[in-house]
Amino acid sequence: MAPGNEVFRVVDIAVKATEARPGAQIVEREFGMFEVHSTSQADVLEAGEVVLSRLGLTMADRIRPQVVSTQVITRIDPYQAQLINRFRRGSILVSGETMLVLECAPAAYINYACNEAEKTASIKLIHVSSVGRFGRMWLSGTEAEILTAKNAAIQALEALQGREGA
């Protein structure tokens, strides 16, 4: 969301009006991002409705996501894998695997794309960044699984409705 400082107010609205709890909150000058979590999906959906209502917005006001770049890199070299893994925690890219780099705008939609990719293919999430102007994810796996994940992520983003972005 923009400006980033609005995240403080919006998280406050969501957690005080519902049973959802904050899961992430990142604030930058231009853009900010937040997540709410609950064991009940209804609580999370209610938090979204409450926030939109308080901001005077509806789902129709959202910006339609755009895929801005995709790269599929096959047979990752061991040295490149080492560079990519340097600051990783959790899943790592293994030499010989295939890597997908996908970027979209607005940034927050990358979380949705990643979720849809993980549902359809046996892949590893290496990196996801959903703050700033563009969201980015790096996935790894076999070439076939990465192509399946790529198609699922792109189809999911392209299926979302909204107004054209700025």
Predicted features, each with a name:
Residues 102:
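Catalytic "initiation/cleavage/transfer" segments centered on a nucleophilic residue
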Residues 120, 127, 133-141, 145-152:
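Preference for long, well-ordered alpha-helical segments
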Residues 37-44, 140-146:
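Helix N-cap motif at beta-to-alpha junctions
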